[in-house]
Design a protein with these regions (language model features):
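Solvent-exposed, charged helical/coil patches
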Residues: 1-39, 112-121
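Basic, amphipathic alpha-helical patches used to engage nucleic acids or provide basic targeting signals
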Residues: 14-20, 44-112
């Protein structure tokens, strides 16, 4: 394992163990290729960041945010970094996931249909 990866892996593990109700609700719909056969993973390190959910094949990141994220400059910087690395980013509020999971899933499916495939390396 590359230096620093242990720290990222441990942080991701802690985040998975302390998921919010909204993250758990969305994960139950994304896990096991339940959403159109797309493989999502949760609390995944990408660069210096850890994202809530990512479909690497479609380069789509899904973040579930609480009130602490309102107008966060940190989130703007994160999203800009991801976009610069050819990821698409969707953000949903916790209450949207908990109160309108169907609408959230429809949005994700719609974006997955548009998302470019993972670039060849």
């Amino acid at each position: 394992m590359r230096p620093g990866n242990e720290v990222k892996t441990e942080r991701a593990r802690r985040l998975r163990e302390n998921s919010t109700d909204a993250e758990n609700a969305l994960w139950s719909r994304l896990r096991g290729r339940r959403l159109g056969g797309h493989k999502f993973v949760r609390q995944e390190p990408i660069g210096v960041y850890t994202v809530d959910f990512v479909c690497r094949e479609s380069r789509l990141i899904v973040e579930v945010d609480g009130g602490q994220h309102a107008e966060s400059q940190t989130d703007v910087a994160r999203d800009n970094w991801f976009r610069a690395h050819n990821y698409r980013v969707l953000r949903f509020w916790n209450n949207d996931v908990l109160g309108n999971i169907g609408g959230v899933l429809e949005t994700i499916v719609s974006v997955l249909a548009e998302a470019p495939p993972h670039p060849e390396r």
